[in-house]
Amino acid sequence: MTEELDNTPSPAGDIPQETLPKPLPAPEETAGEQPAAAPEENRGNAVREEEEAAPVLEQIDINELRKRPLNDLQEMAEGLPIRNAASLTKSQLVFELGKQLLAKGHEVVVSGVMEQAKDNYAMLRDPVKSFRTSPDDIYLGGNLIKPLHLRVGQQIKVRLRKLRPHDKYLSAASVISVEDIPAEDYRARSDFERLTPLFPKERLLLENKGVNSAAMRVLDLMTPFGKGQRGLIVAPPRGGKTVLLKTIARSIRANYPEVELIVLLLDERPEEVTDFEETVDAPVFASTFDEPSRRHAQVSDLVIERAKRLVEMGRDVVILLDSLTRLARGYNANQTGGRIMSGGLGSNALEKPRKFFSAARNVEEGGSLTIIATCLVDTESRMDEVIFEEFKGTGNLEIRLDRELSERRIYPAISLSQSGTRNDDRLYNEQEFVKIMQLRRQLAMKPGWEGLQTLLQNISKTQNNAELLLTGLR
């Protein structure tokens, strides 16, 4: 019936418009009152108002919490249900704060260096703590590792999830970035072992007016450094190796700020570690002499893996290691089983130190890894002698420090006749190489300490090595 009425033509067209009933006027709106909305509109408005009223919780970075002093963290914990906050260590307090912030709905992120724990999971360690195990380390599950083909030593940033009742660590929910590349754009690189090794070709000049120029100028003339060098600083006790290594670090940082410089100190005195951290603008990873040997092995493993990942990215990396002897001692003490060889070394004790040192190389695909390591001699230890003999022929650069020169207070105490670089002609241009060979022949005609003293006197009279090579020895 309704359809029939709707389809019937309206008679309004035949009736004058003025005779039609006028529409009722709209009701007047009372001032200050809004017209009533439909129930659906009311519900929609209410939802929008709730969304607008909901507070936006700020993103929290665990790395920023780690930088803050303990007093600040304790103040943050005052309004949170954290038991005995005043008695917790800084790392424990960071863990508890992260746990509470996640429970409140904050987005919590953190970055760290990946260390493989077992086949199905890994941990993100804090580089600032030299990769020491800590309560605020981050658990990284296999479900995040396998899809992206993540590797040990990579810098990874993750987003954390709320903790479950039996969780012992803060746990990653998703990967945000790998080596500062967004996770969705990241692609696995060629493995370090598959890259093509080459001779060092590009020079690392150490001469710099801002540091001990004399020592660095001697090294540039007698033992030139190249990117991808594998060098040994062979030193007796109190021969000045630590000071020389520190000066090399400062020169590289001043001349090549783009180079990834890493300092690794093993079995070292705590005050020496602090001195390096304060005077060298580079990450310092250390394991002091009061820590167990397995700790020496752990930090060295992570440092070399971190360096390999950087080389895979095409970076130039320099590792300064003090010392290779202590690294070998640490692996030897950490070894279980096997035969005992000469000097008390285990049959397989030098396998990992050898792999560490042999990783130094220039790479055809781009990037390089340079390792300059100190090696102890004249310590009256048979083990140290065996370690030195094992590594003696593996490097392509050797700097020999002389005890007689150091006793005469001649620094740097470098033995000119016993120091040198293999294939150094690749690092000099032709004219420079001719001048260098003339200089070395002149110095070789003098006794050891007289030759070095003559060179240092000529260095003090010239502004730079270029001037010295042009004028010759005086």
UniProtKB/Swiss-Prot annotation:
Organism domain of life: Bacteria
EC number(s) from the headed UniProt entry: 3.6.4.-
InterPro entries reported in the protein's UniProt record: AAA+_ATPase, ATPase_F1/V1/A1_a/bsu_nucl-bd, NA-bd_OB-fold, P-loop_NTPase, Rho-like_N, Rho_factor_ATP-bd, Rho_N_sf, Rho_RNA-bd
Domain spans labelled Rho RNA-BD: 107-182
Keywords tagged on the record: ATP-binding, Helicase, Hydrolase, Nucleotide-binding, RNA-binding, Transcription, Transcription regulation, Transcription termination
Role according to the record: Facilitates transcription termination by a mechanism that involves Rho binding to the nascent RNA, activation of Rho's RNA-dependent ATPase activity, and release of the mRNA from the DNA template.
Protein name (Swiss-Prot/TrEMBL): Transcription termination factor Rho
Primary gene name: rho
